[in-house]
Regions:
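Central antiparallel beta-sheet cores of small beta-barrel/beta-sandwich binding domains
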Residues: 45, 61-142
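N-terminal helix-cap/turn-to-beta initiation motif at the start of protein domains
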Residues: 42-57
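Edge beta-strand at a domain terminus
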Residues: 30, 37-40, 121-123, 129, ...
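Bacterial N-terminal signal peptides
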Residues: 9-19
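Surface-exposed interaction patches
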Residues: 140-158
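N-terminal secretory signal peptides that target proteins for export/translocation
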Residues: 1-4
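Short glycine/serine/proline-enriched coil/turn segments at secondary-structure junctions
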Residues: 88-91, 148, 162-165
């Protein structure tokens, strides 16, 4: 027989399960500033307008080096971005990025290239970050989060895995135009 305390705990759990939207229950914290998508079928509804504030030119620091990033405004169902990591004035690598509307939500797709423009991924492959949630001035893709500090600055956090060790890397962005 269940005690009244057990019934109360079960009641609260059931209320939380129904009161919290499914898209919120479909994610969990991965690192201090990033989330992972636990249920790919429960992504938040979103459009490119929700992330249009990314458009523009940015520069900043990441991985002990400097970077430049440019995002075009939304058009034709996508936003196109370019990222370049520099060390001592030399290109380390490039990224070509696409934010697209798919499955009623957003995905950020990335292809990486060495300084000589040889691809990291196979021809058809890319890295996909699916939208997990919006939280105030933050947009969280699975393993990658952008926090808008103000109109001129944002911070991004990306999950990196090396030899089984998971860590979070911070990138500080400043708008240049």
């Amino acid at each position: 027989m269940l005690s009244s305390r057990s019934v109360s705990i079960v009641t609260v759990a059931v209320l939380i399960a129904f009161a919290v939207p499914e898209s919120v229950r479909a994610q969990s914290l991965r690192t201090e500033h990033t989330y992972k998508l636990d249920d790919p079928d429960s992504r938040p509804t979103a459009s490119l307008e929700d992330v249009s504030w990314l458009a523009g030119s940015w520069s900043g620091e990441a991985f002990g080096s400097t970077f430049e990033e440019v995002w075009n405004p939304p058009s034709a169902g996508s936003m196109v971005g370019l990222w370049k990591l520099l060390n001592d004035g030399q290109v380390v690598f490039y990224e070509i990025m696409l934010i697209v509307e798919e499955e009623g939500s957003l995905s950020l797709k990335v292809k990486h290239f060495n300084a000589d423009f040889t691809a990291w991924e196979d021809k058809e492959d890319y890295v996909r970050f699916r939208l997990v949630k919006f939280d105030g001035d933050a947009v969280h893709f699975s393993g990658l989060s952008f926090y808008r500090i103000n109109e001129e600055e944002m911070h991004a956090f990306i999950v990196m895995t090396h030899e089984g060790e998971v860590r979070e890397e911070k990138m500080v962005y400043r708008r240049t135009r």
